[in-house]
């Protein structure tokens, strides 16, 4: 079981990454992000000096992160944004900005593979490039895949501006571009994301009794979007939450029917926590490439005290 302590992670990030020493003692370089929640082997560093990655590793601008076939890794950025890399993926963070777009917050470049990301609202957007595509987004989530046959882009929430050599479009929440190339006319390629990862919990109205933790059954099912019609599809699931006193399994996998059931343990908030208002948000994504046709699962659970 892995304890999700987002506030602790945030504090640790700023304590550790406010400055990162380089060779000259008179000069420091701020870290852009931190590596976390690694599965299998991951490498990180400058392109010609990559080393085996580890949880808590500080990532500087121009660093690359590369996952092996069964590898996964989460990158937490210092602005609060988050990226989840899937297997056989290579991404540059803080990549060099083009002359006409120096005003963007920072730039990511996908060399190969696939990732999911959520980018928080900011004064300037984040830019993402790869395969002849340029994306700009803020306060939005997306899945981005680059393969030999084309590019897949899906926007589960928010809005993303996408452009290539011949055209540009605004992808709204629930829309995607499937197998597009740098010379395609993008407005003709827009379609809806057809499926969704649905979540529900038992009991549906949990109650804290004193200081005792609760063990709850959490269910997953891929369904046709807008319906409860099941979709038979196996795959790995990545689960996260905005609550610090929550334990979840390290691994969740849907069976061939597209279903899964797991147990999560939720403890009451700390006695001195005056910010907790009783609602815990659970957010799940398909944790591998090839699932750009499945929208994120989102569940808000209301807890009461007895």
Give the residues covered by each predicted segment.
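Flexible, surface-exposed loop/linker segments and immediately adjacent secondary-structure boundaries
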Residues: 26-193
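Short, surface-exposed loop/turn segments at beta-strand-coil junctions that are enriched for proline
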Residues: 267-273
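Short flexible loop/turn segments that cap and initiate beta-strands
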Residues: 223-248, 276-278, 295-296
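Short beta-strand elements
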Residues: 290-306
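Enriched for extracellular/lumenal, surface-exposed ectodomains of secreted and cell-surface proteins
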Residues: 278-294
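Short beta-strand segments of immunoglobulin-like
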Residues: 202-209
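Beta-strand-rich structural segments
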Residues: 211-228
């Amino acid at each position: 079981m892995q304890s999700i302590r987002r506030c602790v992670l945030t504090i640790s990030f700023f304590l550790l990454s406010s400055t990162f020493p380089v060779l000259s003692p008179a000069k420091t370089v701020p870290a852009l992000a931190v590596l976390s929640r690694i599965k299998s082997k991951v490498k990180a560093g400058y392109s010609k000096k990559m080393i085996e990655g580890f949880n808590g590793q500080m990532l500087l601008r121009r660093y690359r992160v590369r996952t092996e076939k069964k590898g996964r890794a989460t990158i937490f950025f210092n602005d609060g944004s988050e990226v989840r890399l899937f297997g056989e993926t290579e991404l540059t963070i803080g990549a060099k900005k083009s002359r006409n777009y120096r005003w963007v917050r920072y730039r990511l470049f996908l060399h190969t593979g696939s990732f999911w990301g959520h980018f928080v609202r900011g004064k300037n957007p984040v830019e993402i490039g790869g395969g002849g595509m340029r994306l700009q987004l803020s306060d939005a989530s997306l899945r981005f895949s680059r393969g030999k046959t084309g590019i897949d882009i899906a926007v589960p929430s928010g809005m993303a501006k996408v452009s290539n050599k011949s055209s540009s479009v605004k992808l709204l929440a629930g829309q995607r571009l499937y197998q597009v190339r740098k010379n395609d006319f993008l407005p003709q390629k827009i379609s809806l994301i057809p499926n969704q990862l649905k979540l529900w919990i038992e009991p549906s109205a949990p109650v804290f009794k004193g200081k005792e933790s609760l063990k709850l059954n959490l269910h997953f099912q891929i369904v046709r979007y807008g319906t409860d019609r099941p979709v038979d599809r196996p795959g790995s699931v990545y689960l996260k939450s905005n609550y610090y006193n929550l334990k979840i399994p390290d691994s969740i996998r849907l069976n061939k029917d597209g279903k899964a059931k797991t147990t999560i343990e939720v403890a009451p908030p700390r006695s001195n926590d005056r910010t907790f208002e009783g609602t815990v948000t659970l957010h799940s994504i398909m944790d591998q490439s090839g699932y750009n046709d499945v929208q994120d699962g989102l569940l808000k659970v209301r807890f009461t005290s007895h």
